[in-house]
Curated annotation (Swiss-Prot):
Involved in the breakdown of putrescine via hydrolysis of the gamma-glutamyl linkage of gamma-glutamyl-gamma-aminobutyrate. Keywords: Glutamine amidotransferase, Hydrolase. It comes from Escherichia coli O157:H7. The lineage of its organism: Bacteria, Pseudomonadati, Pseudomonadota, Gammaproteobacteria, Enterobacterales. This is Gamma-glutamyl-gamma-aminobutyrate hydrolase. SUPFAM superfamilies: Class I glutamine amidotransferase-like. Residues 16-250 form the Glutamine amidotransferase type-1 domain.
Amino acid sequence: MENIMNNPVIGVVMCRNRLKGHATQTLQEKYLNAIIHAGGLPIALPHALAEPSLLEQLLPKLDGIYLPGSPSNVQPHLYGENGDEPDADPERDLLSMALINAALERRIPIFAICRGLQELVVATGGSLHRKLCEQPELLEHREDPELPVEQQYAPSHEVQVEEGGLLSALLPECSNFWVNSLHGQGAKVVSPRLRVEARSPDGLVEAVSVINHPFALGVQWHPEWNSSEYALSRILFEGFITACQHHIAEKQRL
């Protein structure tokens, strides 16, 4: 049996919650299981690790960074807008932005999902639509909370893959496919540092990658949902873990 301790170490950002009155940081199992099934070892990263001296000690131990989805939203002041965000998680923002900036500098692989994509957009100088439902030209991208969870994560709309990018390299035989959709915010302006990898039929950005980086991919949908059952999802996670293995080899050569 393979020793999981030999697998790439993937740092996973958590979300702030309250449990019976106590401040708590949590991770949904589906995000962790997707990494394990793809051959990685997920390690939860407490928000306190955003402190620069701790982050500096942490980064050499990580082979990849995983930014999962969340019920919370990125604070608007981080992308130049005024107003409060009722569903904010400032400590997650702080850690995620620090991790993204460090990973881009050190060429550490990143896989970002839903809120994670939005963090990647903001960290590289872009901005977000705060309420997609107020954009009349866009589809309804939110899930129906009254439906069972399995139906909330069912395919909702197609995405069209842009040619010549990371996503098309990972999925060379698949230029369009159906995805689930469970988000109220989305990319508005994408920095020149990013390549748009896929769009939904209404033109909304559904995937991005960082230009001149070995693997920094963000997707707006949720491939972690039952990832082992869907070939496209497995390919994304396995591509991420393969990039992490290449990063390990690069570190060993230095």
